[in-house]
Amino acid sequence: MAKPAAAARPRRRERKNITSGVAHVNATFNNTMITITDAQGNTISWSSAGMQGFKGSRKSTPYAAQVAAEDAGRKASEHGMRTLEVEVKGPGAGRESALRALQAVGFQITSIRDVTPIPHNGCRPRKRRRV
């Protein structure tokens, strides 16, 4: 006979007390992902436009990036985070709006870096779209 399933107790997230961190904004043509880490690179919170309920081409809009950045920022501020360095990667539409949303949540932004990878004539690019 099968044993009754033990009541799975929800694991309480321990509240870390981290005052400064790094916000990694990855803005692609299809989505915008925001990950907030501590100085060592350990993830504190993350969010994306798709996680916020945007589907299809609406994920790539600046508004979707703003909502995702507000969500990730709110989660990180629960851990006591106050100051952020921002690293922006990619060519997407949500770069600036995600940055403004992080400021609106109440973070003090100390530096902004563009870490978009640029090839020194590496792989052959995709063919041009003809619309």
Swiss-Prot record:
One of its GO terms (cellular component) is ribonucleoprotein complex. The keyword 4Fe-4S does not apply. Coiled coil: none annotated. This is Small ribosomal subunit protein uS11. HAMAP family: Ribosomal_uS11. Part of the 30S ribosomal subunit. Interacts with proteins S7 and S18. Binds to IF-3. It holds the Pfam family Ribosomal_S11. GO terms for biological process: translation. Keywords: Ribonucleoprotein, Ribosomal protein, RNA-binding, rRNA-binding. One of its GO terms (molecular function) is structural constituent of ribosome. Belongs to the universal ribosomal protein uS11 family. It comes from the Bacteria. Located on the platform of the 30S subunit, it bridges several disparate RNA helices of the 16S rRNA. Forms part of the Shine-Dalgarno cleft in the 70S ribosome. The keyword Cell membrane does not apply. PROSITE patterns: RIBOSOMAL_S11. InterPro entries: Ribosomal_uS11, Ribosomal_uS11_bac-type, Ribosomal_uS11_CS, Ribosomal_uS11_sf.
